[in-house]
Amino acid sequence: MLQFPQFDPVALRLGPLAIHWYGLMYLLAFAFVYLLGRYRIKRGQGGNLTYKDLEDLIFYSVLGVVLGGRLGYVLFYKPGYYLSHPLEIAFLWEGGMSFHGGLIGVILVMLLFARKKGVSFFTISDFIAPLIPLGLGAGRLGNFINGELWGRPSDLPWAMVFPQSGSMLPRHPSQLYELGLEGLVLFALLWWFSSKPRPSGQVSAMFLMGYGAFRFLVEFTREPDNFLGLLAGGMSMGQWLSLPMFLGGLVLFVLTARRSSRQP
């Protein structure tokens, strides 16, 4: 059994300015996306996208993540509460974001961006998909440093006591599982897969399948939200949202493979 290390929530102090670890992780996430995006454009893997296009895409994607993530949390996790307290939807500083909602927000941004550029949606999504996992990993590291989103009780040797959980039960460090699978492993998989020419849409399909599968598996070790618990079939909300994500990616992968095989 391991003891959760108590981190100072402030990573860096610059006079009166305090930079928190969680905010620093978000900055790192977008820095990863920007630097890797520039690299892909330089390698000719961004079609006719320019560095300016990348900057615009990141800026609007941030808005999509924040707005979509917040609305996704409201609709997927606490619709009844926010129906009674609608003004609190805007209270972002109180926490409450959904990855799946943020993904929907980014998809809408990419649809509008592709239309503006006069290119296909998959030109944009295939370009951006390999850039996302390291950003996701940075976010999960921020969750771990904050001591939040801990796992279910476990007797494994690396199980960890999270004082913020309100008990002294050793638990899965599920944030680190997600950092490893949804961050590092998925990044390596997509970076390798996208390094060679693929049918349009297949890199996006691999992202949907990879994230959906990894998130579904890790949810078996992650403590369910206390206000929801487990839902139908003994699955968590995260699993129910990840299942259609995986299946959608699988269907897209098969369709793009068939379409490619028919082309001379």
UniProtKB/Swiss-Prot annotation:
Pathway: Protein modification; lipoprotein biosynthesis (diacylglyceryl transfer). One of its GO terms (biological process) is lipoprotein biosynthetic process. The chain crosses the membrane at residues 17-37, 57-77, 89-109, 118-138, 173-193, 201-221, 237-257. It is found in: Cell inner membrane. The keyword Secreted does not apply. Belongs to the Lgt family. This is Phosphatidylglycerol--prolipoprotein diacylglyceryl transferase. The gene is lgt.
